[in-house]
């Protein structure tokens, strides 16, 4: 019983101490998505869908929820963001070739159609895409892909 008491106190102290150690935040501003939006020309509705459902994990600007102030949850969130940006980062759009941009949009379509994006862990507190928003997003992504496919054909000539 004595060891359980000491262990509990140690655990509580550890929890308190880690509250003062925070990971770096992903807050570099929405200007980092401007090239992506300039090239893909989303409507205002699609831009809002992207901002509300995609940019938190797939851009250099994250709108953090209140629970990000609690360690170790904030470390878990940062890992999700790093992983999301590793797979699809609209803030790095200018570094992608036309082929890669087409492929990234193809993956976006695939993951949204299969219900894999947005992640369930994200939608628990942020809400999910409505069926209409999903269809609108998919149509926009397909149209955007056509532009990149045209660019690839031009380069092949």
What are these regions (language model features)?
Residues 1-39, 143-157:
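Post-cleavage N-terminal segment of exported redox proteins
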Residues 40, 44, 48, 99, ...:
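Soluble non-cytosolic domains of exported or imported proteins
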Residues 42-55, 77:
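Sequence/structural segment immediately N-terminal to covalent heme-attachment motifs in c-type
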Residues 50-61, 117, 137:
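The canonical Cys-X-X-Cys-His
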Residues 66-72:
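Short cysteine/histidine-rich zinc-coordinating motifs and their immediately flanking basic loops
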Residues 75-123:
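Extracytoplasmic electron-transfer domains, predominantly the class I c-type cytochrome c fold
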Residues 114-116, 123-152:
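C-terminal capping alpha-helices of c-type cytochrome domains
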